[in-house]
């Protein structure tokens, strides 16, 4: 065998060995990326970061991931933190939090999530672009809080969680006392893109709004004097549902173009004013009621025990509150504010802001009075 042939053989073997090592390293890297669940391919609202190295408390790698979407605005950040903390401590499931916020809140949120008490949490911070709402929302000073951009994040779930087939959305004014896996396993009927808790269920008493009648049916949210609403042939007495907590089948959501349907009714409301003038609930409710009319499944009412923020009085017994799977302080009185019912239950899950920017108003007031 000539010297030239020997060199060629050695070169071929060297190249083969190099490719073998490269292939092995590539497989290892791919496995690592899968295990750490990194993802930067979201179109629309952009992921700011993801923390893959969080310690997991005995999570089986074969478990299905449970995406939980929650909006976190700067002035309500403590609420989102308490909600996340309560979910994490009451489950052993593989939960990933998609925390939707605005750019100016991301750093504050990130520093809070780096607290020792929250280091086991797996999360992704997703920036919501308010430009998505241009031409779809009109300014209304009477709506105040519900007009903020993040209120509408729930309409864009397939964009926020692009790779998931199913997800949970919940507001920031909740505390979870049950295992979130049970809510995630809610059975949705064929063709249904979401499951909500209806306002006529037995767990939540009916709310009477001054000037609006009973705020638990469609007529409380939509203006039935408008021809476009009447043409939909929706019964005004139909029980409404609460959009603050729901389970979404994202495959079905995409198939039915739910986001596009919701945007259509948002635009029509800007042009024609289709929502009830006595609307007391969230401004996100009317378009959801239209799109999901007789086309939604239901969740266990104990997974959305609400109206805790409607008054300072305790409308539920301590025993009932303890048995609830999820407590919801919807209404004007928030558990981080001056007064609300069962603030002690909420405060159990609250973690103080390490930056000192967010304070419980009642505590701050008490300290000021002492001084």
UniProtKB/Swiss-Prot annotation:
Glycosites: 249, 257
Lumenal side: 29-371
Enzyme Commission numbers on file: 2.4.1.-
Protein keywords: Glycoprotein, Glycosyltransferase, Membrane, Signal-anchor, Transferase, Transmembrane, Transmembrane helix
Cytoplasmic-facing ranges: 1-7
Entry's localization field: Membrane
Top EC category: transferase
GO cellular-component term (any): Golgi apparatus
Membrane topology: Single-pass type II membrane protein
Pfam families named in the record: Glyco_transf_8
TM segment ranges: 8-28
GO molecular function: UDP-glycosyltransferase activity
InterPro entries: Glyco_trans_8 (IPR002495), Glycosyltrans_8_dom-fam (IPR050748), Nucleotide-diphossugar_trans (IPR029044)
PANTHER family hit by this protein: GLYCOSYLTRANSFERASE 8 DOMAIN-CONTAINING PROTEIN, GLYCOSYLTRANSFERASE 8 DOMAIN-CONTAINING PROTEIN 1
Family: Belongs to the glycosyltransferase 8 family.
The protein's name: Glycosyltransferase 8 domain-containing protein 1
Native organism: Homo sapiens
Lineage summary: Eukaryota, Metazoa, Chordata, Craniata, Vertebrata
This protein's encoding gene: GLT8D1
């Amino acid at each position: 065998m000539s010297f030239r042939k020997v060199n060629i053989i050695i070169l071929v073997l060297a190249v083969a060995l190099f490719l073998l090592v490269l292939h092995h390293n590539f497989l290892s890297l791919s496995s690592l990326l899968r295990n750490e669940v990194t993802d930067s391919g979201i179109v629309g609202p952009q992921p700011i970061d993801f923390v893959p190295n969080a310690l997991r408390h005995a999570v089986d790698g074969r478990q299905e991931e449970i995406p939980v979407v929650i909006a976190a605005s700067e002035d309500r950040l403590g609420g989102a933190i308490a909600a996340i903390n309560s979910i994490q401590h009451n489950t052993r499931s593989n939960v990933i939090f998609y925390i939707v916020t605005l750019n100016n809140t991301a750093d504050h949120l990130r520093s809070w999530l780096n607290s020792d008490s929250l280091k086991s949490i797996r999360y992704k911070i997703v920036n919501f672009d308010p430009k998505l709402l241009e031409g779809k929302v009109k300014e209304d000073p009477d709506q105040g809080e519900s007009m903020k951009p993040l209120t509408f994040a729930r309409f864009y779930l397939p964009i926020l969680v692009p790779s998931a087939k199913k997800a949970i959305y919940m507001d920031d004014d909740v505390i979870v006392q049950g295992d979130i896996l049970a809510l995630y396993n809610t059975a949705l009927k064929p063709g249904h893109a979401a499951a909500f808790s209806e306002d006529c269920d037995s767990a939540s008493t009916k709310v009477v709004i001054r000037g609006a009648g009973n705020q638990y049916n469609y007529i409380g949210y939509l203006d039935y004097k408008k021809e476009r609403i009447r043409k939909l042939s929706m019964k005004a007495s139909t029980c409404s549902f609460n959009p603050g907590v729901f389970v979404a089948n994202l495959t079905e959501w995409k198939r039915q173009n739910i986001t596009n349907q919701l945007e259509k009714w948002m635009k029509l409301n800007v042009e024609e004013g289709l929502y009830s003038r006595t609307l007391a609930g969230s401004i996100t409710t009317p378009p959801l009621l239209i799109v999901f009319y007789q086309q939604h499944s239901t969740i266990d009412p104990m997974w959305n025990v609400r109206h805790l923020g409607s008054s300072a009085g305790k409308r539920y017994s301590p025993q009932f509150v303890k048995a609830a799977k999820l407590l919801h302080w919807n209404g004007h009185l928030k558990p981080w504010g001056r007064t609300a019912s069962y603030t002690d239950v909420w405060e159990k899950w609250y973690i103080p802001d390490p930056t000192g920017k967010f304070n419980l108003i009642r505590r701050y007031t008490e300290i000021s009075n002492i001084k």
